[in-house]
Amino acid sequence: MKKLIFLCLVLFSGMFFGQEIEEILEVPWPKEQKWKQLYDKKGLTSRLVAYLPDKESENDWTIKGRILYLYYAAENDVADVIDTYKDTFENNAPNAKMKVLEISKNRKTAIFKIENIRAEKLPHKVESELYYVFMGYDTVCIVFVSVKEKKLSTAFVKKWSEIFKNSKYSYREIKEKTDE
């Protein structure tokens, strides 16, 4: 009987633990616009998924949503992620303004915005972005929306902050291969 139980444990553990899983964040994109997936680029240590409203295109958009997954992340505090973004934008878009809006008590989630982002190659084009950082078990999930505006309105920040906070964290089996 002990051998039978041991055999069952070995077989079932292979079924459950032999599968590769990934952490995901399911964002409830606003229903007033139908959203479509623009692309899903997956590498060995990251994944970037982009979304647009159904009637917009990659070259002609008013709002773009993206989810960046950083796998095997060593960070355990959202402040590390925020500092990385701050350093990046200070070096690459010095006129951009960053403001941290909220950090959870357990330091696993944060919301911040970066406004007046101008690319060096296209200084006449300006964007602003609102970010939501979620620290998973070993994945950092960063959701952000971009608009072609110099500043984000209070209503925009409030609406999207609520959307981000209503995202569902879960796991799923990895079925696709990476691009790398």
Regions found by a protein language model. Give the residues of each.
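Stable alpha-helical elements in mature extracytoplasmic
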Residues: 31, 78-81, 85, 156, ...
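Surface-exposed amphipathic alpha-helical segments
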Residues: 138-180
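Secretory pathway targeting signatures of secreted, lumenal, and periplasmic proteins
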Residues: 34-73
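Signature of long, low-cysteine stretches enriched in small and polar/charged residues
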Residues: 90-132
